[in-house]
From Swiss-Prot:
This is Diphosphomevalonate decarboxylase. It comes from Danio rerio. Coiled coil: none annotated. It comes from the Eukaryota. SUPFAM superfamilies: GHMP Kinase, C-terminal domain, Ribosomal protein S5 domain 2-like. Its EC number is 4.1.1.33. GO terms for molecular function: ATP binding; diphosphomevalonate decarboxylase activity. One of its GO terms (cellular component) is cytosol.
Length: 400
């Protein structure tokens, strides 16, 4: 396509964040609408360190919808992608019928998306990806209002990435899912001392995807039903209270207990699912020994459907814990490769602490770590030079 053919080209680029659940979503009561068996709650991470960037262009010259993810063309006919595209076009058409300006929804779209973190390795890439897709489509087609229900149809946890800070995904009661939406509990500025440390154990794609894993859990795990009915409702209330009171020991305890219960459900699934590996188990042990040394919860772990740990802590405690991780998982790469994100001050470790923790170091057990904090929801990228698609509507070399 030559550029003069695309005089009508419209293009929007946005970024969207990863969110990491502290009360986990695991299991659907409706596979088509992606309605959960339990409510969940997450922290939205800062986009300076983890984000999806998506450019969407539309033109009457495009013959079909296309999508490229991390430089590779993907199948646009995927049912979840189609659900999001159809729903946004339906909402845009409704606005157009009321006289609001909107791009021509009959025009085909080209979508180009990149993650600045490993895809499908348990770092919530689908949540950021679908949130970014829906938000960018909404900007392109001038769709306003509640979008989390649309993002949910792409990936359940994507609905939480449409807001910054602390976000709950409500269980909802309606069979059509209209009330199963995300809602902000507190903004990213509410608890400025909270810090997040991601310990990347493996960037490999997991052997059992979340979608198939949770389907098997719903079919076979009695513990899943017990958790949804008897545990999560009370735990959600406790977690929201801990966030509002900025009560880190309670926040940390609830976070770790919920992570453990999620992985217990994975073991209770038949056949069982193993997302954690030996390094994951060592990290769990390290966190508990570190907290025991101080007699209080200073750091807390959570693991999604993968071996990588997400550590929550407070600004004053994080520097020392970073050194603890370095000591017990000594890196075999340089500092720039091993530590990324928000800088932390150097800290010294006492011989007494190292002796008390009493763990054998595992060299190269952790590939790298990312230091970050809570951050805002999706944003529009104003600089046209940062578009991932060129004037011909095809991916730029930089996006491949």
């Amino acid at each position: 396509m030559s550029e003069n053919i695309l005089q009508d080209l419209e293009m929007v680029t946005c970024t969207a964040p990863v969110n990491i659940a502290v009360i986990k979503y695991w299991g659907k009561r409706d596979e088509d609408l992606i309605l959960p068996v339990n409510a969940s709650l997450s922290v939205t991470l800062h986009q300076d360190h983890l984000r999806t960037t998506t450019t969407i262009a539309c033109s009457r010259s495009f013959h079909k919808d296309c999508i490229w993810l991390n430089g590779k063309e993907q199948d646009i006919s995927h049912p979840r992608l189609q659900s999001c595209l159809l729903e946004i076009r339906r909402l845009a058409q409704r606005r157009k019928n009321t006289g609001d300006p909107a791009s021509d929804v009959s025009n085909k779209v080209h979508i180009c998306s990149v993650n600045n973190f490993p895809t499908a390795a348990g770092l919530a890439s689908s949540a950021a990806g679908y949130a970014c897709l829906v938000y960018t489509l909404s900007q392109l087609f001038n769709v306003e209002g509640e979008l989390s229900g649309v993002a949910r149809q792409g990936s359940g946890s994507a609905c939480r990435s449409l807001y910054g800070g602390f976000v709950q995904w409500k269980l909802g009661e309606q069979s059509d899912g209209k009330d199963s939406i995300a809602e902000q509990v507190a903004s990213e500025l509410y608890w400025p001392e909270l810090r997040v440390l991601i310990l990347v154990v493996s960037a490999e794609q997991k052997s059992v995807g979340s979608t198939s894993g949770m389907h098997t859990s719903v079919e076979t795990s009695h513990l899943l039903k017990y958790r949804a009915d008897a545990v999560v409702p009370g735990r959600m209330e406790e977690m929201i209270r801990a966030i509002r009171l900025r009560d880190f020991p309670k926040f940390g305890e609830l976070t770790m207990k919920d992570s453990n219960q999620f992985h217990a459900i994975c073991l209770d699934t038949y056949p069982p699912i193993f997302y954690l590996n030996n390094i994951s188990h060592q990290i769990i042990s390290l966190v508990h020994r570190y907290n025991q040394y101080y007699g209080e919860t200073r750091v807390a772990y959570t693991f999604d459907a993968g071996p990588n740990a997400v550590i929550y802590s407070l600004q004053d405690y994080l520097p020392e814990f970073v050194e603890v991780v370095r000591h017990f998982f000594p890196p075999e790469v340089n500092e720039e490769e091993f530590f990324k994100g928000l800088p932390v001050c150097p800290a010294d470790l006492s011989e007494e602490m190292i002796r008390d923790i009493n763990m054998k170091p595992t060299p190269n057990g952790i590939r790298y770590m990312i230091s970050t904090k809570a951050g805002p929801g999706p944003r529009v990228v104003e600089d046209p030079n940062l578009h991932l698609l060129g004037a011909d509507g095809l991916p730029k070399k930089s996006a491949v």
